[in-house]
UniProtKB/Swiss-Prot annotation:
One of the GO BP terms on file: translation
Keywords: Ribonucleoprotein, Ribosomal protein, RNA-binding, rRNA-binding
Protein's name in the database: Large ribosomal subunit protein uL24
NCBIfam families linked to this entry: rplX_bact (TIGR01079)
InterPro entries, alphabetized: KOW, Rib_uL2_dom2, Ribosomal_uL24, Ribosomal_uL24_CS, Ribosomal_uL24_KOW, Translation_prot_SH3-like_sf
SUPFAM superfamilies according to UniProt: Translation proteins SH3-like domain (SSF50104)
PROSITE patterns for the chain: RIBOSOMAL_L24
Subunit structure: Part of the 50S ribosomal subunit.
HAMAP family listed in its UniProt record: Ribosomal_uL24_B
Gene3D superfamilies linked to this entry: 2.30.30.30
Disulphide bonds in the chain: none
One Gene Ontology MF term: structural constituent of ribosome
Amino acid sequence: MFVKTGDKVKVIAGKDKGKEGTVLSVNVKKNRVVVKGVNKIKKHQKPSQTNANGGVVESEGSIHASNVKVISKKEDK
């Protein structure tokens, strides 16, 4: 896949078109990537022992790899 974790990318299609961020994770089998600050989804959490209050948790969802363009590669040491 042309995108690796840590690369800086720009979204070229979809509702978040024009936004930039770094790649947090890559799913090669499904050809999807998770970009920091892009495609925010809200998940309703039920109260549990670890999270007593519950509530709404916001996190990044995945987007298809064809909808992003690499701006700069992660520098390898």
